[in-house]
């Protein structure tokens, strides 16, 4: 079983941090680096077609420095290791300040596209197994009006027609979680 609490915590924390973006919009010169450019990108994107909005957000977020999750080891009172935590999900706000790894890129794109009016029901943060990376990897899946699915990956241009190399494990948005593992 997977623990989806990190995703729901990010959704709640993002809502709490929205006031930071509003403050940047009202007082742009008080905002640091990527937060200032975020407001500019959102304003610029509002006048673009849906496809151009998606392309702009994808390029903007993918320019953010990659920062792998830190490994945190957990020990019991006797000093024996009892667990390791590797993945911490970041909000859009935290991602813009600190950078992040694949799930943070997907989450940042998700929240930016929602801000631009793309329906939550058309978006999924998807945890996959990537044959190219030989490991787990998160991407953003976006359903287009023609029902095609685009994948927004932190490592590649938008994949509009091919999803080869990705095995979907689970997907989520603010409405639900989907388990894509095969049951044998």
Language model: regions and residue ranges:
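A structural boundary/capping signal
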Residues: 1-184
